[in-house]
Amino acid sequence: FGGFNRIDFNEDGYKVSPVIISPERKSMLNYNLVMFFTGFTRFSSDIQKANNAGESNENKIKKLKEMYSLVDEAEKILVEKNSDLDEFGRLLDYTWKLKRTTGEKVSTESIDALYKKGIEAGALGGKLLGAGGGGFLIFYVKPENKQNLINAMSGLLHVPFEFENGGSRIIQYTAEDYEG
C-alpha cells in the first residue's frame, strides 16, 4: 500500500485508511526509529501455533482489544502537530509489554535481554516486528541517544530504512533457471 496506513480488520476483511502525517513529523519519526536484525530466525506459523495454546481465549481477546484500543492514541500522536512525538516511543514500550503477555513464544530470554539493553541505552520504547520469536527489533529513541543505542546494539546488524510512499515493488531481479 505504501505510506502510513491504518488497517482495520473486521469479519468481512479489512479497510485501509491513509494516515496523513506532515513531512516534518514523518522525517522526525523516521530519524527516531532505529531497526536491528536480531539474528534469530523462526517460522511465524510455529510461533502462532505455540501462542494459540495455553491461556484462555477470553483473556487473550481482552489483551488484544486493549492493544487495538491504543491504535487511535498512536494515530493521534502521529497526526497532531502539537503532540509530543516521544509519546509514540512510550506507547511502543507499553504495547510491546502487553504483546509479550499474549503468548509464550512472542519473545525469548535473548530478545528480552536485547530489548532491555536498548531501553538502558536510551530508547523510549520498541517492539519486535512480526509474529515474534526473532526477526527485526525496532526502537524509538530521541536524537541525542541514537548513537548510544547503536553502540549498545553493536552485536546486531543495524538496518537503516526510510518510509516509502509507493508501496512494495521489486528493486532487484535476478533471473533464475527453472526446469519445467
Identify the function of each model-found stretch:
Residues 134:
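Glycine-rich active-site/cofactor-binding loop and its immediate structural neighborhood
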Residues 1-126, 138-180:
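C-terminal nucleotide
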